[in-house]
Amino acid sequence: MSRSLGIPVKLLHESSGHIVSVEMKSGELYRGSMIECEDNWNCQLENITYTAKDGKVSQLEHVFIRGSLVRFLVIPDMLKNAPMFKDVRGKGKSASLGVGRGRGAAMRAKGTGRGTGGGRGAVPPVRR
């Protein structure tokens, strides 16, 4: 089953090879070079400066971080110019009808719906 990736996950993949900071839900902080990152935010870092909750700092060579334990990531500012953001800005309001979640917008735009028409406030048909 193929899914399209959201902007945050794409940005995470773009950060491979750059220095990132990863704060864990437990309060620990890892700062190092991102080797690889997965869609579920599992990350591999190398040459890490690890800061424990109590402030003690140590150096680590290589770590694997479980994505579900990550609170947030800090990535380099240079990635704000990544090509994925240019696509988002260029779209504007010229989207075609019916694009989005569900059918509501397409049905309203066409003026049709389910059933024989009518609904609240409409005059019911006269039966003979």
Swiss-Prot record:
Disruption phenotype: No visible phenotype under normal growth conditions, but the double mutants smd3-a and smd3-b display embryonic lethality. The keyword Disulfide bond does not apply. Residues 90-128 are annotated as: Disordered. InterPro entries: LSm4/Sm_D1/D3 (IPR027141), LSM_dom_sf (IPR010920), Sm (IPR047575), Sm_dom_euk/arc (IPR001163), SmD3 (IPR034099). GO terms for molecular function: RNA binding. Expressed in young seedlings, roots, leaves, flowers and immature siliques. It comes from the Eukaryota. It holds the Pfam family LSM. It is found in: Cytoplasm, Cytosol; Nucleus. Residues 7-79 form the Sm domain. Disulfide bonds: none annotated. GO terms for cellular component: cytosol; nuclear body; nucleolus; nucleus; spliceosomal complex. Residues 112-121 have a biased composition (Gly residues). SUPFAM superfamilies: Sm-like ribonucleoproteins. PROSITE patterns: SM. Belongs to the snRNP core protein family. This is Small nuclear ribonucleoprotein SmD3a. It comes from Arabidopsis thaliana.
